[in-house]
Amino acid sequence: MDTIHYMLDNAGYLASLTFQHLWLVALAVGLAIIIGVPLGVLIVRHKWLATPVLGAATLLLTIPSIALFGLMIPLFSLIGHGIGVLPAVTAVFLYSLLPIVRNTHTALDSLPPGLREAGRGIGMTFWQRLRWVEIPMALPVIFGGIRTAVVMNIGVMAIAAVIGAGGLGLLLLNGISGSDIRMLIAGALMICLLAIVLDWLLHRLQVVLTPKGIR
């Protein structure tokens, strides 16, 4: 009951931290989509790149999150931004790359060869085939990678509070430092709820964007 009262009494503060958390995750995953999807296309077209690119992305994901955030501090201190949003978003961006690149590569590489041959047969260029045939067919799997990145990094971004990025992780950090169990439970509940809601919303968006013929 104490936790519920705390959450009701601090609803405005919790909402502010939630939107801040959402913005940080959206920025990191958005950058990963911009970089990761074209990178996935590239390693499908140039297959010799697949092993080193996917290997590097996998290696990044094996680094403990607190260690990766710690590594960002001296790197970004060189440009005067050792703590705050920039190193946090960069770390989460790196974590987001693997599921997006891997799913893009898997989705495009597993398409039936006949689709590409049919596109070539009617005179489509590579980019036309990619835009009108391959990406629409691969979209459900690509979106699966985006969903994985978002849900995974809702939790990872909470740790970014230790380097001054803000977000819902502040509740956990302040709860630990102040031995306030209400803040700890409230922070954990908000992070879990946010991950569940975003996963559901992205699933609905995936259904809407998937061509009717392959739903």
Curated annotation (Swiss-Prot):
| Phenotype upon loss of function | Deletion of the osmU operon eliminates the residual osmoprotection by glycine betaine in a mutant that is lacking the ProP and the ProU systems. OsmU deletion has no effect on the utilization of glycine betaine as an osmoprotectant when ProP or ProU are functional.
The record's annotation in Pfam families points to: BPD_transp_1
Concerning what turns on (or off) its expression, the entry says: Induced by osmotic stress. Part of the osmU operon, which consists of four genes (osmV, osmW, osmX and osmY).
| Entry's localization field | Cell inner membrane
> What are its GO biological-process terms?
glycine betaine transport; transmembrane transport
Write out the GO cellular component annotations. plasma membrane
Q: What are the ABC transmembrane type-1 domain coordinates in residue numbering?
A: 18-202
Q: Which residues form a coiled coil?
A: none
Keyword NADP listed: no
Tell me which CDD domains the record gives: TM_PBP2
Q: What does this protein do?
A: Part of the OsmU ABC transporter complex, which is involved in the uptake of osmoprotectants such as choline-O-sulfate and glycine betaine. Probably responsible for the translocation of the substrate across the membrane.
Oligomeric state and partners? The complex is composed of two ATP-binding proteins (OsmV), two transmembrane proteins (OsmW and OsmY) and a solute-binding protein (OsmX).
Family (UniProt): Belongs to the binding-protein-dependent transport system permease family.
- What is the protein name given in its UniProt record? Osmoprotectant import permease protein OsmW
Species name for this entry? Answer: Salmonella typhimurium (strain LT2 / SGSC1412 / ATCC 700720)
Which lineage ranks, top first, belong to the organism behind this chain?
Bacteria, Pseudomonadati, Pseudomonadota, Gammaproteobacteria, Enterobacterales
